[in-house]
Amino acid sequence: MDEKTTYPKFAYDATKIIVYGGGGLSKMIIESVRVLGVYQIVGIIDDNMQEGEDVLGSPVLGGAEELPKLFEEGVRMAVNSVGGIGNYKVRLKVFHTLADAGFVCPPIVHPTAHVDPSARLEAGVLVLAQSYVSGNARVGMGTLINNSVVISHDCVV
């Protein structure tokens, strides 16, 4: 008798990720995610853009109302690309929306950035190109470290 090997069907695909926000910052985030080579961008969620538009070739899927459908399809990862310069509450609201819908926001570190092994990055941290996070630094949830920024040793951000 020939046995056929079967594998379990997992409830989600850890390589699929959505980008929440389609503005200017999203272009830097999309490029960072692509060159990282870990995730496949499923699309953009943006409450102020039309479904079918695209940002750097990634399709706009709709607004926050699409999150339950994406979750049902097995997408669990998200990156917050809403800037909110001068008003962190805008970014924080997006993190709450994503968490309430069951999504996880992993840290994203551009391959040209360097994070020392003793540094700690919390959920949703974005470390963009040419940045450096030094020894024993702590970078708090959702922090955006823009291009070419240095976070020195023992700093708490």
Predicted regions and their residues:
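A solvent-exposed beta-alpha-beta segment
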Residues: D2-V82
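Residues that form or flank phosphate/diphosphate-binding pockets in enzymes
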Residues: M28, K89, D116
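Short amphipathic alpha-helical segments
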Residues: I30-S32, R91-V94, V139
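Residue-level detector of anion-binding/catalytic polar loops
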Residues: P59, V104, V150
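Short, hinge-like loop/turn segments at secondary-structure boundaries
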Residues: P59-G62, H96-T97, G124-L126
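Short glycine-rich, flexible loops that bind phosphorylated cofactors or substrates
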Residues: K69, G86-N87, S134
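Glycine/small-residue-rich loop that forms an oxyanion/phosphate-binding "nest" at active or ligand-binding sites
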Residues: N80-I108
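Structural signal for interior beta-strand "rungs" in well-ordered beta-sheet cores
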Residues: P107-V157
